[in-house]
Amino acid sequence: FSGLVADRLTLLDGSRSECDSDQYGEGSAHQGLLPASEQASRTRRDYVTNSNDRYWISNASSRYEALSPILGPHSNQLSLRTRSNFQETEAILAGGKMDRARAKELTFGNKSLAAELMVDPFVAACNSDGRFVGNCAVLGEWDQRFEAGSKGAYLFERFWNSIRNRNDLWTVPFDAENPLTTPR
């Protein structure tokens, strides 16, 4: 499998008893299904969020203990989309009453946490290098939005996709105790 597919599949070894799905069933709707009591579930009065990423954190102040590995890894790095979702949710709550203009900006803002984290340091580094002055100028003037008229969006997307999986990308590595602000 490719890395993309392998990260999203759970394969069970049918020759091992601990992988026998028939062991599940008590408390579930059907034999072989993981019971709801062993799945991530949270009821809160403030918020829960889900970005189709990791089960272990759906509220910044309340994390799940490790659950069945079938639900995915625990305490691992969140996607930038998930981190951005938490930031936007916290901003909504801190901002008070939601009006139409604010809802529209949050929904259609086309912003990028990757750009917020990377553009300024990249522009500073590439300006000192001198080989990519034109690219640096475009990114330095970019509004860091992905709007039709945002000059620099395509350049950043190409740049980001070429470096996003580098092991040396961040100066502060992922920390499971600070998953919403690391890596950076």
Which residue stretches match the model-derived regions?
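Long, compositionally biased non-active-site segments enriched in small/hydrophobic residues and glycine
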Residues: 1-184
